[in-house]
Amino acid sequence: MIVRLHAIYQDITRDYLPPASLNHLMLLSKQTQHKLSFKSAPIPDLQPFFKNFTSKTPGSAKESPCSSTAKISSSISISSQCIFNVVILSFVFTSQNLNLPSHPALHNVSPESLNDRLMTQLECANSPRLACELWVGTDKEPILSPNSVSYRVMQPNEFES
């Protein structure tokens, strides 16, 4: 069974995801709908780092050159031509590597249905240091109570090449 987890970033970097086997990593630019999908080996943690956040200013007719780099656990490098202010990352994990709790909402849900309904979503404001809520749930109710997840905006000299 495959469980899809979605994360929304606003010009920030994220430093934690539950240990899981990463099958694909899709980078989706909300403005261009451009998708990049990569296969990778199992990794203990997912730690993407984005670099060179320069993009077209909303409402501006002029586009600035932009590029980005994602690095996962110092072993998998992913790059794309342009990452905009709001980036949606879609992570696909195998469920046996994701410790889902026993929850009544899951008792009568088929794996196929759960695959379509289960999600983890992170929403953060653009701030130097902030806490976000991590939650897992179906389209009707959360399965996990919100947990605190720490974020911070990395300085240019902190990004790995």
From Swiss-Prot:
Q: Which domain of life is it from?
A: Eukaryota
Extra information: Almost completely overlaps SKI8.
For membrane topology, the record states: Single-pass membrane protein
List the keywords (alphabetical): Membrane, Transmembrane, Transmembrane helix
The protein depicted here goes by the name: Putative uncharacterized protein YGL214W
Q: Which residues cross the membrane?
A: 76-94
GO CC terms, sorted: membrane
- Report the principal subcellular site: membrane
In which compartments does the protein localize?
Membrane
